[in-house]
Regions:
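A domain-level signal for the structural core that forms small-molecule/cofactor-binding pockets
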Residues: 1-62
């Protein structure tokens, strides 16, 4: 079973449609690799992280 985990700043997912679109797109991408028969077994987890706990280049985003 493919398991795909995405972590991003939580503000990216304020609109619930954003997470739905990302989940669908990642599932479709995995199916191009594993085949359509894998679709029922592909898990996608989208995790929003507060900007204060997300760092880039050694510094928190907030």
């Amino acid at each position: 079973m493919p398991y795909i985990e995405v972590k991003a700043v939580e503000q990216r997912f304020e609109n619930p449609e954003s997470a739905r679109k990302l989940i669908a797109a990642l599932t479709d991408a995995a199916c191009t690799v594993f085949g359509e028969e894998a679709r029922a077994h592909i898990w996608v987890v989208v995790d929003g992280v507060p900007a204060s706990r997300f760092g880039v280049a050694g510094k928190p985003l907030a």
